[in-house]
């Protein structure tokens, strides 16, 4: 078939396989499309350097986070990125873009254009994360842009049913043009199953670069309560570059990059040696880390919200806790760690669930089937 061109543009420069975007999912996603025989090519692009400098100057703010968001939310930046996309020659009927940063329908009105998303600004606004200090004007401009572009698409693909419903309800895209094709894990190799894995050691694992958004402070509070009942409990934290304090029983491993062999090996060992994965996020559009934990036979305790409800099944592959609630989180951790046999059963079911539903090969098959239908 090979009738699909994938466009990756914006913050990642001109490398469509950059590990710095899309939570590191670009390369495995493109590899799966290629293996499925649907990918013609993937292209990366950026705003020309001089114009980009002008846009950066226009949106300058002493706060780098606000500066970055105002720049990316600026309609002038998104229009410039769309013009950059238009200059790329295409020879396929179907074009797919990752995210909302530009508009393929505007660049190629004679093509069938699709966008693919793990989140959107509407859901981010509801969460309140990452928008402090941004002007209401910029937020409104970006929100309108996303809605406009989504409605121009031949089809919109989402990582989850939760997000599919957001595009239909918040952006008013007709339901028959929004498809939940799922998302996948970003493991270069699937670890072998371990029939002899034991769960007697009370060893908790947390992985998340954005410590506050991922519920790290709430987990630390809950862990203090857990240690009162299980004094030898351990909490291993990877992802953030630093912690203000490291309480007793907490093992801090810093940021671990899969691109670095030694750090990837350390990350793999944390997955192998832990008995429970906990991610009490305050906002989590999708959540790849819990899926990867389940491949390592780790039951997952996550927030009862967003797409996490679709990936973790209570009492079967893990459990759900209310957002931001410390005591229920602590109680559930104690309950799970106190029942190693239950953890083992959850771990087996979780691995089967992820390998059956949440691989990029499975996503590529769904995309192929959907494209044929449109």
Protein language model features and the residues they cover:
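Short hydrophobic beta-strand element within catalytic cores of glycosyltransferases
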Residues: 299-303, 312
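Nucleotide-activated donor-binding/catalytic signature segment of Leloir-type glycosyltransferases, i.e.
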Residues: 239-276
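Conserved donor-binding/catalytic core segment of Leloir-type glycosyltransferases
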Residues: 196-214, 220-227, 235
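Conserved acidic donor-binding segment of nucleotide-sugar-dependent glycosyltransferases
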Residues: 314-315, 319-326, 335-340
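A short, well-ordered alpha-helix in the C-terminal region of glycosyltransferases
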Residues: 328, 335, 342-357, 366-369
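Membrane-proximal helix-turn-helix segments that form the acceptor-binding/catalytic region
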Residues: 135-156
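Aromatic "clamp/platform" in nucleotide-sugar-dependent glycosyltransferases that forms part
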Residues: 282
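Carbohydrate-associated surface elements
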Residues: 162, 184
């Amino acid at each position: 078939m090979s009738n699909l061109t994938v466009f990756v543009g914006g913050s990642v420069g001109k490398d469509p396989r950059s590990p710095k975007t899309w939570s590191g999912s670009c390369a495995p996603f493109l590899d799966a499309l290629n293996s499925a025989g649907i990918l013609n090519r993937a292209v990366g692009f950026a705003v020309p350097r001089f114009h980009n400098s002008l846009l950066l100057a226009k949106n300058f703010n002493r706060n780098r986070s606000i500066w970055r968001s105002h720049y990316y939310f600026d309609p002038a930046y998104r229009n410039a990125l769309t013009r950059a996309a238009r200059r790329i020659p295409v020879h396929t009927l179907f074009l797919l873009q990752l995210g909302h940063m530009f508009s393929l329908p505007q660049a190629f009105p004679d093509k069938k254009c699709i966008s693919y998303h793990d989140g959107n600004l509407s859901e981010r606004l509801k969460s309140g994360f990452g928008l402090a200090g941004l002007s209401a004007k910029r937020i409104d401009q970006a929100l309108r842009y996303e809605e406009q572009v989504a409605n121009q698409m031949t089809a919109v693909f989402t990582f989850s049913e939760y997000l599919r419903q957001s595009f239909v309800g918040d952006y008013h895209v007709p339901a028959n043009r929004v498809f939940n094709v799922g998302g996948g894990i970003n493991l270069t190799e699937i670890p072998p199953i371990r029939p002899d894995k034991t769960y007697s050691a009370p060893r908790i694992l947390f992985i998340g670069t954005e410590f506050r958004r991922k519920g790290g402070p709430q987990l630390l509070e809950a862990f203090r309560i857990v240690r009162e009942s299980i004094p030898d409990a351990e909490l291993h934290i990877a992802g953030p570059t630093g912690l203000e304090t490291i309480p007793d029983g907490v093992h801090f491993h810093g940021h671990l990059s899969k691109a670095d062999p030694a750090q990837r090996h350390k990350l793999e060992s944390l997955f192998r040696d832990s008995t429970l994965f906990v991610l009490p996020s305050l906002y989590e559009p999708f959540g790849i880390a819990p899926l990867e934990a389940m491949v390592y036979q780790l039951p997952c305790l996550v927030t009862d919200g967003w797409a996490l409800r679709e990936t973790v099944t209570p009492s079967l592959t893990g459990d759900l806790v209310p957002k931001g609630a410390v005591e229920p989180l602590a109680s559930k951790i104690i309950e799970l760690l106190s029942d190693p046999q239950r953890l083992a059963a959850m771990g087996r079911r979780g691995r089967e669930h992820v390998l059956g539903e949440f691989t990029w090969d499975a996503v590529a098959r769904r995309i192929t089937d959907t494209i044929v239908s449109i």
